[in-house]
């Protein structure tokens, strides 16, 4: 596959930013069966403290998609949680509006909802599920891998550190999240809450993306993911939601396998 490293100025972020893309191996080949059709697209989001190169450097993603006609878009979300923060950058609008428009024009991406998927791990899992539920008209399906369900709370981070997982200083993480989400006591009723968005989407008319939650059985974020899955089961009967627990921790060994489960869920061919 072709790997593209793109630097661009974002009007929503008001700064330069970066994107890594995987382009199909068969692009432009005379005997390809696509004959000018636009490409399906998978937006793939990284976690807190990572960047747009993490999926490509630390998993076998390119190998899995070697013979698939799909474009993978991996934006640099920095530590912005893929939302328009209270006192931070507009990563939500950048992800769901500016980026699809710009890349669609440059890389012949399909604008159709049924060809558009989004996934991510940890902070990116939160961003993927939130984007799909906040903009159900844009995405056919979304997958959250080891989703950081409550990004306003730091309760799971000390336990993660005890297991040897690399995390930034807790004070810095807490300061960053409060700039984005505001006071903790306002979170559950805010537009940042996955539960609030799920309930809103469940009660709304119109398209509803299929949702997948994956988590490792030794992940410190498992209790929060189980709680979110129970909420879907108890309060969102109109949503197509799947929750699956597999062996693994909060690391790329697990996410390397989990992304294949997500690709199968999306109906995207892979090895």
Locate predicted features.
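Non-catalytic cap/lid and distal C-terminal segments of serine-dependent acyl enzymes
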Residues: 1-271
């Amino acid at each position: 596959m072709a790997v593209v490293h793109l630097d661009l100025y974002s009007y929503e972020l008001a700064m330069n930013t970066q994107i890594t893309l995987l382009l199909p191996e068969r692009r432009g080949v005379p005997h390809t069966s696509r004959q000018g059709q636009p490409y399906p697209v998978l937006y793939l989001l990284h976690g807190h403290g990572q960047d747009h190169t993490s999926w490509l450097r630390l998993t076998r993603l390119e190998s899995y998609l070697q013979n698939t006609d799909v474009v993978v878009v991996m934006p640099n979300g920095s530590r912005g949680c893929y939302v328009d923060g209270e006192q931070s950058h507009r990563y939500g609008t950048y992800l769901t509006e500016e980026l699809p428009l710009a890349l669609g024009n440059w890389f012949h991406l399909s604008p159709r909802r049924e060809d558009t998927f989004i996934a991510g791990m940890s902070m990116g899992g939160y961003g993927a599920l939130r984007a799909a539920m906040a903009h159900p008209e844009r995405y056919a399906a979304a997958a959250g891998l080891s989703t950081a369900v409550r990004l306003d709370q730091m309760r799971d981070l000390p336990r993660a550190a005890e297991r040897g997982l690399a995390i930034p200083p807790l004070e810095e993480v807490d300061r960053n999240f409060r700039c984005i989400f505001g006071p903790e006591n306002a979170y559950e009723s805010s537009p940042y809450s996955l539960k609030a968005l799920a309930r809103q989407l469940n009660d709304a008319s119109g398209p509803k993306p299929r949702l997948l939650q994956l988590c490792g059985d030794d992940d410190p974020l498992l209790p929060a993911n189980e709680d979110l899955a129970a909420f879907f089961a108890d309060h969102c009967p109109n949503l197509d939601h799947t929750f699956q627990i597999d062996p693994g921790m909060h690391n790329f060994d697990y996410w390397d396998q989990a992304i294949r489960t997500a690709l199968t869920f999306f109906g995207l061919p892979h090895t």
